[in-house]
Design a protein with these regions (language model features):
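Conserved internal helical-beta-strand scaffold that buttresses enzyme catalytic cores
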Residues: 1-156, 160-173
Length: 174
């Protein structure tokens, strides 16, 4: 999944996308932080060792924290943001859509207005296979996606089929 994300970022940047906002649950998050967003592994381990105190609030599960960085693409520098993630699977999806829409408005690039495309900001949502199929918020977010006030012009959805969330065996394995 890391090579796929990297390819999406590089191609989107090559087409002129200036920001990409990623939403995902915990599985694969640390890998993405280090290998895509460029977070220093030493800093990551310091957070887990308790050497870094949160600036405000009571703290959260370490792998729920967000992060942002800039990367070079064929089209120039692009800003990447990994959204903070609550423990409720898939709830990050509508939050991410709102964040992207706000960024598009800030850039005066909201889709469906004055022939704008919204291509300056790309939402990317990474789902686990069980959560994608089982959480109604995914379909509810799809339902909002084409309404005038909520559309972002399209979202890249990646479903990771890790078969961890399902409790029944595959028929071939039974």
């Amino acid at each position: 999944f890391i090579p796929a994300i990297n390819e999406i970022i590089q191609r989107a940047g090559g087409y002129g996308t200036k920001e990409m906002v990623i939403g995902m649950a915990h599985r694969g998050r640390l890998n993405l932080l280090v290998n895509i967003l460029g977070k220093n592994p030493a800093d990551l381990f310091d957070e887990f060792d308790g050497k870094v105190q949160p600036e405000k609030g009571s703290g959260d599960v370490k792998y729920h924290n967000g992060f942002s960085s800039n990367v070079m693409t064929p089209g120039g520098e692009a800003h990447l943001a990994l959204a903070f993630n609550p423990s409720h699977l898939e709830i990050v999806a509508p939050v991410l859509q709102g964040s992207v829409r706000a960024r598009q408005v800030r850039r005066n690039d909201q889709p469906l207005q004055d022939n704008k495309t919204g291509n300056s900001v790309l939402p990317i949502v990474i789902h686990g296979d069980a959560a994608f199929a089982g959480q109604g918020v995914v379909q509810e977010t799809f339902q909002m996606s084409q309404t005038r006030a909520y559309t972002t012009g399209g979202t890249v959805h990646i479903v990771i089929n890790n078969q961890v969330g399902f409790t029944t065996s595959r028929q071939e394995d039974a």
